[in-house]
Amino acid sequence: MNLPRAERLRSTPQRSLRDSDGEDGKIDVLGEEEDEDEVEDEEEAASQQFLEQSLQPGLQVARWGGVALPREHIEGGGGPSDPSEFGTKFRAPPRSAAASEDARQPAKPPYSYIALITMAILQNPHKRLTLSGICAFISGRFPYYRRKFPAWQNSIRHNLSLNDCFVKIPREPGHPGKGNYWSLDPASQDMFDNGSFLRRRKRFKRHQLTPGAHLPHPFPLPAAHAALHNPRPGPLLGAPAPPQPVPGAYPNTAPGRRPYALLHPHPLRYLLLSAPVYAGAPKKAEGAALATPAPFPCCSPHLVLSLGRRARVWRRHREADASLSALRVLCKGSGERVQGLRRICPRPRGATATCSSDHQACCIPRPLPLCCKCPPPPLLGQFCSNSSSIRRRTAPTAALPPRARCWAGTCRPRRPC
């Protein structure tokens, strides 16, 4: 700002202190002061013109603490002269409605989700509600959850599924709608202290039933079969039925009752694959039923597992071998009677023989050469039954038809076709 003034002073000729007459005159101090005032006015006008050219036309915005200033305030002197005027015109924007509403947000209730669900179920006259009904009760009762509805609905669903105090009740066919009902377990009524939902007294756990407690089988079944035979009853259902005594498991059985009333679904196949031998039954008259065999004492889990492996190996030939062996036992001799169920040992040319009771190894029957003209026995089902006891009759070999004698092993086997 001082440089133009200095150049101008240099360019102006120096005034002489002498008059035209050559005499010394007085110094004109006032004239110099007027010249200085004119120079300052010119400089202010030039700076004002420069500012007007740099600014855009219309409303000019200047950053003054994040507030927009009009153009007249910029041209008037670069800022407001009065601080009070600046405070009244340029105040901070008011807070939004959402911010003020957040300030008045209600507090979260001091209840857990289990307590909220229990409240909703107990206020219902039928003491049961669906998931949507529980959420509707909580939203209508507590404004805090009304504002945040979609967020806590999954928490209610998880608490219903994971806690044993809540029981799912299927919807009846005659009642249309969506979703199952949820109710409280009757044994969980003392879960809260004196009806106060602020704190639970204890965590409720539903009692688990031991699998295999009511098994009607002589041998324990696997877990999957035990679950099918003995499903766990629900808590809202009646008390479970008393366990039925396992037949043959206790020595003191009622008179007239057979100890092993329930056997394998296929008795003949089960007897052929089992290692221990039944004890001999007393002889009876021809046509009388065979006495019930006594329970075999040497049955162990390891033996049952080994027999199961052998049964899987010979699964393909088991059906045909069982039918042949059963018919040979029935048609063995003319005057000979069966004194007990014994296994058949394979012989090379179709001859039959029995194993002694002290022989512990399992004799696996093998298929014998068949006659080309003899069809398989059609009436095998007459001798095999799925009941608890097996009744068999013996008949002389001479009274049998030729086909039966051929299958019984009395006729000479022919060359296979």
UniProtKB/Swiss-Prot annotation:
GO CC annotations on file: chromatin; nucleus
Nucleus as UniProt keyword: yes
Secreted listed as a keyword: no
Keywords linked to the UniProt accession: DNA-binding, Nucleus
Species of the source: Homo sapiens (Human)
Encoding gene (name): FOXD4L3
Name of the protein in its database record: Forkhead box protein D4-like 3
Gene3D superfamilies, sorted: Winged helix-like DNA-binding domain superfamily/Winged helix DNA-binding domain (1.10.10.10)
Domain of life assignment: Eukaryota
Classification via SMART domains: FH
Basic and acidic residues: bias regions: 1-29
Segments of the chain annotated as binding DNA: 108-202
Residue span of region Disordered: 1-50, 70-105
UniProt-recorded Gene Ontology molecular function terms: DNA-binding transcription factor activity, RNA polymerase II-specific; RNA polymerase II cis-regulatory region sequence-specific DNA binding
Pfam family, one: Forkhead
Compartments where found: Nucleus
GO annotation terms (biological process): anatomical structure morphogenesis; cell differentiation; regulation of transcription by RNA polymerase II
Regions of compositional bias (Acidic residues) in chain numbering: 30-45
